[in-house]
Curated annotation (Swiss-Prot):
This is tRNA uridine 5-carboxymethylaminomethyl modification enzyme MnmG. It is found in: Cytoplasm. Its cofactor is FAD. InterPro entries: FAD/NAD-bd_sf, GIDA_C_N, MnmG, MnmG-rel, MnmG-rel_CS, MnmG_C, MnmG_C_subdom, MnmG_C_subdom_sf.
């Protein structure tokens, strides 16, 4: 029976990137989804990027992924967040037209031979401990050498409006009813997680004159260097909760399925519902909310920061307690969704199941929260699924390589007991792993892995040769008694001013000029982080043999032995990041390894 090399289950942000990456390697790919028209839809906020997330998108772009292209093409408002802070944490956020984003994502996917199939996957097809493909609810069998599960919130999904619930993966769409049982049968541990989304408000019912306007930046930012035609088109707005908002929530917590104990799933710590904010931060008089347009021609605005699972009739009162929303009409109510997710410590660093070779997973099913986290995992899972189908070894991104490396290392090495969100604070080498140098860091890997053509690498290498040449020129240049580099390191000085006084032989692009300025001004910090990276690599070089009997390692604490036995780290670096493993345990393990364990 003819089949596929890779079958991707789900058409969200993880599934899109998985199918796109797998197809880059020339294998036969099928993407199975209940509704192909909804591929790439954004069920929550209509935006891409933000702190920690824009860095992920930049790395996805560098690795040949499609999210950055789709976001730029659909952009209607862009801003760089944390602009007043250092380059390590500056983060682009791109507001998009929700429908246009999905359309552009589907158009990009169609550039590669991915077969899109309508259907619900009911089970993995496994015989004799081997993965043979998937079976669908309507009785089809789809043979495949590898499968990527990217089911988002659909695995046994339940949506909640107050104390009332119904099976759904998200509003108006049925859940994946059977796949969870198949994953359990393979040996995976499933947990219940929860997330939520705010209400959508009819735009003509909002008094925008009472809101604070946030204009788009001009010129607009972009992930790919090619801003879309509408990237500086629309503003966003801000409002705040009031004393009445908080009172309505506190007086009606018994109607919340979370506080009433109906929802067993664990919600995201860093994206809490408005109920959680009011309860957890009782000392705050108000909470900032962002009012975002859903698109260029939509009649809806999105109330970011106001996700809720309270009943619809109460949401009406809550929304109308906000300045500018006194006459607001809710088009779609907020709701919570509860779903199954895997324990990611049961995966390899290539996002492959430890129980069933050829089975990969990505996105919220791995315990993460957010489009960007899903896309990053999808790309890695799709790449490795294709490599598995071709008989090639798994590849992964080490922690020191960037944000995707940290994301996967945290998930697989430490696990998560709540929906995981990427933040800049999680990344030890964030000054080395900036969004602006993702191309330098990851394009060589993308080309080596078959995700991008060699001419892309040649362009990137030429760019950084020009940067290096300009840094050498500035080192030799004398300005006011010091070298050009020393002059540029003064806080009040800029490369633009220096280049106007002492022009380079060939003008640099804005991106190249930015690289010169960052590398000059932060040279000392960059050198410090490079030394830290070398230490991390030294620990990574300490490989731990497969099947090591940790309880027999002399000097290892009982807790460390238990944790190491559970997580099975492959290196001393991985062992160091496991909670409960102390420095003394690492020393004992290193001594044991040096003795030829």
């Amino acid at each position: 029976m003819a089949g596929y090399d890779v079958v991707v289950v789900g058409g969200g942000h993880a599934g899109l990137e998985a199918a796109w990456a797998a197809a880059a390697l020339g294998v036969r790919v099928a993407l199975v989804t209940v509704n192909p028209d909804r591929i790439g839809m954004m069920p929550c906020n209509p935006a891409v990027g933000g702190p920690g997330k824009s860095q992920l998108v930049a790395e996805v772009v560098a690795l040949g992924g499609l999210m950055g292209r789709a976001a730029d093409a659909a952009a209607i408002h862009t801003r760089v967040l944390n602009r007043s802070k250092g380059p390590a944490v500056q983060s682009l956020r791109v507001q998009v037209d929700r429908d246009l984003y999905a359309l552009k994502a589907q158009e990009i996917l169609a550039e590669r031979p991915v077969e899109v199939l309508r259907g619900e996957v009911a089970a993995l097809w496994v015989e004799g401990g081997r993965l043979l493909g998937v079976r669908t609810v309507d009785g089809r069998t789809l043979p495949a050498k590898a499968v990527v599960v990217a089911g988002g919130t659909f695995l046994s999904g339940v949506v909640w409006y107050g104390r009332k619930s119904r099976p759904a993966g998200r509003q108006g769409e049925p859940p994946a009813r059977f796949l969870s049982q198949s994953l359990k049968a393979v040996g995976h541990t499933l947990r219940r997680f929860k997330t939520g989304t705010p209400p959508r408000i009819r735009a003509d019912s909002v008094d925008f004159g009472r809101l604070e306007v946030v204009p788009p930046e001009v010129p607009p930012g972009s992930f790919t260097g090619n801003p879309g035609p509408h990237a500086a088109r629309l503003p966003t707005w801000q409002t705040r909760t009031t004393e009445r908002t908080h009172r309505l929530i506190l007086e009606n917590l018994h109607l919340s399925p979370l506080y009433a104990g109906d929802i067993q799933g664990i919600g995201p710590r860093y994206c809490p519902s408005i109920e959680d904010k009011v309860v957890r931060f009782a000392d705050k008089e108000s909470h900032l909310l962002f009012v975002e347009p859903d698109g260029l021609s939509t009649t809806e605005v999105y109330l970011q920061g106001f996700s809720s699972s309270l009943p619809p009739e109460l949401q009406e009162e809550m929304v109308r307690s906000l300045p500018g929303f006194e006459r607001a009409v809710i088009q779609r109510y907020a709701y919570a969704v509860e779903y199954d997710s895997l324990d990611p410590t049961e995966l390899t660093r290539g996002l492959q199941s430890r129980f069933l070779p050829g089975l990969f997973s990505a996105g919220q099913v791995n315990g993460t929260s957010g489009y960007e986290e899903a896309a990053a995992q999808g790309l890695l899972a799709g790449l490795n699924a294709a490599r598995f189908a071709l008989g090639l070894p798994e590849v992964h991104l080490p922690r020191e390589s960037g944000y995707i490396g940290v994301l996967v290392d945290d998930l697989v090495g430490r696990g998560t007991d709540e929906p995981y969100r990427m933040m800049t604070s999680r990344v030890e080498l964030r000054l080395l792993c900036r969004a602006d140098n993702a191309d330098e860091r990851l394009t060589p890997l993308a080309v080596a892995w078959g995700l991008r053509p060699r001419e892309d690498l040649e362009r990137v290498e030429a760019k950084y040769r020009r940067v290096a040449a300009e840094l050498r020129r500035l080192e030799a240049l004398r300005v006011e008694g010091v070298s050009g580099l020393q002059w540029l390191r003064r806080p009040e000085n800029t490369y633009r001013a220096l280049a106007e006084r002492f022009p380079p032989p060939e003008p640099l692009s804005p991106e190249e000029a930015y690289q010169v300025e960052v590398r000059a001004k932060y040279a000392g910090y960059i050198e410090r982080q490079e030394r830290l990276r070398e230490k991390m690599r030294d620990l990574e070089a300490f490989r731990i043999p497969e099947g090591m009997d940790f309880p027999k390692v002399p000097g290892l604490s009982r807790e460390a032995a238990e944790k190491l036995s559970r997580h099975r780290p492959k290196s001393l670096a991985e062992a160091a990041r496991i909670p409960g493993v102390r420095d003394s345990d690492l020393t004992a393990l290193a001594v044991h390894l040096r003795r030829g364990a």
